[in-house]
Amino acid sequence: MSDVTVNEREEPAGVAVAGAGVDAGAAGAGAATADETPTQGTLPRSQVHVGEPEGDPLMDAQDLIAGYLPGVNILNGASLTLHDGEIVGIIGPNGAGKSTLLKSLFGLVHIRSGKLLLRGEDITNMRADKLVSRGVGFVPQTENVFPSLTIEENLRMGAFQAPKLFKERFEYVSSIFPKLALRKGQLAGSLSGGERQMVAMGRALMMKPSVLLLDDPSAGLSPMLQDETFIRVKEVNRAGVSVVIVEQNARR
């Protein structure tokens, strides 16, 4: 079992973090449970360590302070370390700042203080399109497909920075999500919730990222579709993609 520790500093914790290596299954994932009295509206100061990974971190978020409104911090000194091959899960109550953390890692929420590194490069507040070119993908929780476009057209949107590589990347994504190739002409708006998640993840994988940020991919899905979603996440991880996932069912 992977060892996970959350070292609290000043604020009471509002999240817990689970970590698993590439080959770790649900039963093998370690989890740290934070203070049971959460701080609504702020993600706490926490430092995450998963097992004893080798080498330098792939992504390293250090003491991030961020928020949407002037003077109102949602992240209040949050730190997270992701190594090659890991799946790091972030869990916590609604309003704790989990989605805000992912958005700050993807350049969608301004980081007011702290530092974000990718392979040692400072990417703090880098634009999302620049992060995509550096190997970071993001799948939002809602409105994560273009409903009036076909599956194939959605995937083409994911390869907008490398259109000449579309065929190669489509084959790569289809190897993980075979259904997408079989139904590539179907409108994304006609798909079920689980199928939309496959399209959204597939689109994020079209640039072959090394880091994939997933925001609650099983939200609103039936238990059966949740199981299928987690199987796909593990397949993505086995394909060489490190994952940071916000998930209420992180134990899976």
Where are these regions (language model features)?
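N-terminal intrinsically disordered, low-complexity tails
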Residues: 7-34
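Glycine-rich phosphate-binding loops of nucleotide-dependent enzymes
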Residues: 3-4, 18, 35, 41-252
